[in-house]
Amino acid sequence: MLFDQRGSGQSLPHGETAQNTTQDLIADIEVLRQQLGIEQWLLFGGSWGSTLALAYAIAHPERVSGLILRGIFLGTRAEVDWFLHDMGRFFPEAYDQFVSYLTVEERGDILLSYHEKLMDPQALVHQPAAERWASYETSCSTLRAGMRRVTGR
């Protein structure tokens, strides 16, 4: 069974961030489990979903038979810094596109600058910011190194 968490996918209202905390999402998962009459379940999650699955398992260990996690993201400062700064070394074109949306001043705090744009009520501001963020994340999700780069020949 798959579900879309608050504000994402087919969940309505789309893109809503009010009352959309990790604790709210954990509560939603628990309500869903109860409504489906599932005693214990195996959770699967990737990226943010891995974080959410782990948080749910910590809150409700008796309801989780196991976890299958991929692309694990724990939300640590080091992981966020890697995403915002260091990952660009491996994906320079994607990184350039990502930061080029920001002014030189805004690049001093990429996370804050994107947060402000993503939370802006005006679609002309938040939509392109969301597209740039998603494009960067998607571009960096796979590593396709050419054979020359791998073998050195």
Label each region the model flagged:
Residues 14-25, 78-81, 85-86:
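Catalytic nucleophile-loop/oxyanion-hole region of alpha/beta-hydrolase
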Residues 39-85:
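Conserved hydrolase catalytic core segment
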Residues 82, 87-153:
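Alpha/beta-hydrolase
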Residues 11-14, 35, 54, 78:
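Active-site-proximal flexible loops/turns
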Residues 1-12:
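Conserved alpha/beta-hydrolase
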Residues 23-42, 59:
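Conserved acidic catalytic loop of the alpha/beta-hydrolase fold
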